[in-house]
Amino acid sequence: MVHNDLDFIFYNNLKHSSGAIEHLGDNLTGDGDXDDEEIIIDLSLIPQNISRINFTVTIHEAGERSQNFGQVSNAYVRVVNSDNSQELLKYDLGEDFSIETAIVVAEIYRHNGEWKFNAIGSGFQGGLAALCRNFGLNV
């Protein structure tokens, strides 16, 4: 569950109040090489009351445009060490989400004082609104 609306980082709230998480902006086209969107996280600044961070993707106005993630190719999430640009891990979404318009891709969570990564790949119909309801938010 999200503690409050300000903990939900997305295209209308790009930076967490702690400064620990910043979304560098929404790529509306997906054109070009390399990463389309970036989220910068400083784990040392994450408030102690936050034990889990979920990474999600949605398709804006997917219903109106008859779009879903089954139509998206080459989608992935990767974790990169910003100090040396080393890729620590990469999770490919695949094209198995034929009706989903929102996906919980992965999470990082605290375990015994360390941060761990968990690939999830759980899809939702209903886009951003359905995703928000899943985390206890109303849009």
From Swiss-Prot:
Pfam families: TerD
Classification via InterPro entries: Stress/Tellurium_Resist, TerD
Domain of life of the organism encoding this protein: Bacteria
Protein function: Not known; could confer methyl methane sulfonate (MMS), mitomycin C (MC), and UV resistance.
Sequence similarity: Belongs to the CAPAB/TerDEXZ family.
UniProt protein name: Chemical-damaging agent resistance protein B
